[in-house]
């Protein structure tokens, strides 16, 4: 396993839609393992393949187990997992605002409004289709990582003024990281 370099915004790869994974082979399995190692090394909750320069529809996450009262049956959080070719099939009308950060936009966090619940289908490493219902941080992180796969940075959900300020700061931070 290897720690991969994380792509820092602004970078064209981060605003490019990732392509479907058509063959889940040993190279893809190795990439998933490397992404987990990279995410843990960077102390992140999630990491999309585009964030390590691979324009494929894959992300990894580790949302620690938590108990959420008053959540519908079948929803909740999970630990370490990954998704290949994820697709959200259902989003709740109910939305929540929470602060998010991103390994590709270091030293920033912003309040973002997102749907509270979702259902997502995806492929596992055995090429089997899976379905997951999610709420809380799990749902939020799935939406954040799926945005990456669609070429959308989380700061795009901000007003134009806040987005422009966030990108200006990102440019300064990137210069610091490149030194």
From Swiss-Prot:
It catalyses: N-terminal N-formyl-L-methionyl-[peptide] + H2O = N-terminal L-methionyl-[peptide] + formate. Its cofactor is Fe(2+). Binds 1 Fe(2+) ion. Fe cation binds at residues 102, 144, 148. One of its GO terms (biological process) is translation. The keyword Iron applies. Transmembrane segments: none annotated. One of its GO terms (molecular function) is peptide deformylase activity. Keywords: Hydrolase, Iron, Metal-binding, Protein biosynthesis. Belongs to the polypeptide deformylase family. Removes the formyl group from the N-terminal Met of newly synthesized proteins. Requires at least a dipeptide for an efficient rate of reaction. N-terminal L-methionine is a prerequisite for activity but the enzyme has broad specificity at other positions. This is Peptide deformylase. It comes from Wolbachia pipientis wMel. The gene is def.
């Amino acid at each position: 396993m290897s720690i991969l370099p994380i792509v820092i915004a602004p970078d064209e790869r981060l605003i490019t839609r990732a392509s479907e994974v058509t063959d889940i082979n040993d190279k893809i399995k190795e990439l998933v393992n490397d992404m987990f190692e990279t995410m843990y090394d960077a102390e992140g909750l999630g990491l999309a393949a585009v964030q390590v320069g691979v324009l494929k529809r894959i992300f990894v996450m580790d949302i620690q187990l938590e108990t959420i009262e008053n959540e519908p049956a079948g929803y909740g959080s999970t630990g370490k997992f990954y998704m290949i070719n994820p697709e959200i099939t259902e989003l709740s009308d109910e939305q929540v605002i929470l602060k998010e950060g991103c390994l590709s936009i270091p030293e920033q966090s912003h309040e973002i409004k997102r749907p509270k619940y979702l259902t997502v289908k995806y492929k596992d490493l055995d090429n089997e289709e899976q379905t997951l219902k999610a709420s809380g941080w799990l749902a939020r992180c799935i939406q954040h990582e799926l945005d990456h796969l669609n070429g959308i940075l989380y700061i795009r959900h901000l007003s134009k003024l806040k987005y422009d300020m966030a990108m200006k700061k990102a440019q300064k931070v990137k210069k610091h990281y490149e030194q």
